[in-house]
Amino acid sequence: NQNKSRRVFGKPETFSVHFPDKAGKGGKAMKRILTAAQMKQADRNTIETMGVPSLVLMERAALSCVEELQNGTWDTGKVLAVCGPGNNGGDGAAIARILKTKGVDAELFCLGNPEKYSEGMRAQKKIAENYGVREVKNPDFREYTVIIDAIFGIGVSRPLAGEYRRAVEAICASGVPVLAVDIPSGIHTDTG
């Protein structure tokens, strides 16, 4: 079970990455990668202009992650979604819930002050609990076959501190494969 990552280099305004051509012709297709500001604007436009609720965006993100987890390259024997206080955490709670409905042993480890959770995180956590997803405190990350990094997404631009830093360090030290929602927590969206 190898976790491969793509590295992208360039100025934030001009990030692009090469992917194999989907037509199978061996060529290269270019995909534009947005900056954090551009991605936030795209989310805002989708919600405010197009009328797509934030919870629908979370559900779509969660479904995409579940699809990746079930592509045959991940061992989903026991999954832990490590959730931050924002909508990225809500994505993680939704992933755990969807996995649970598919018979996967999925649990939540929620960081931050529950009184400061985003509306989306509160809603997705409650739904996950209603589906029987258990929240754990002080997990031994080595007990899991996959960890979902849903701590922070594109919105964070400062170094990790406190319980967030400790969680990321423990996840890294565990050696367990990690699937990050949006971007690995602690990585600056524009500069890497």
Task: Tell what function each PLM region has.
Residues M30-D75:
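Positively charged, low-complexity intrinsically disordered leader regions
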Residues T14-A29:
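Short, Lys/Arg-enriched N-terminal segments with co-localized hydrophobic residues
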Residues R6-R7:
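Basic polycationic patches enriched in arginine
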Residues M30-L34, W74-G192:
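Glycine-rich phosphate/dinucleotide-binding loop and adjoining beta-alpha-beta core of small-molecule
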